[in-house]
């Protein structure tokens, strides 16, 4: 990525996904990158703050093994699992409980 700066960073990363064959995975990863870059621009973390966030994720990963998948628990704690369940089980306007 030449000329990497705040304005070109996101597009540069998205271009690196061009070889992803699974279109849905590419769409999801692209959206995650766009939103994550916006969070970084909005909050302007220091390197130490960002390292703390990465260390948190690293510690979570170290707790995982063949029986424990702590990223699922993290997804639950962050409300992501329930949001995905809610989205995937939407009721139509004409549908009753």
List the predicted regions and their residue ranges:
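Feature of secretome-associated and extracellular-like proteins
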Residues: 1-96
């Amino acid at each position: 990525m030449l000329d990497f700066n705040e304005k070109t960073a996101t597009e540069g990363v998205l271009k690196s996904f061009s070889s992803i064959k699974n279109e849905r995975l590419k769409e999801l990863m692209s959206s995650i990158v766009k939103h994550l870059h916006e969070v970084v621009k909005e909050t302007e973390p220091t390197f130490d703050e960002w390292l703390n966030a990465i260390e948190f994720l690293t510690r979570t990963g170290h707790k995982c093994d063949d029986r424990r998948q702590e990223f699922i628990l993290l997804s639950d704690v962050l409300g992501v699992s329930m949001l995905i369940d809610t989205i995937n089980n939407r009721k139509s306007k004409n549908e009753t409980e």
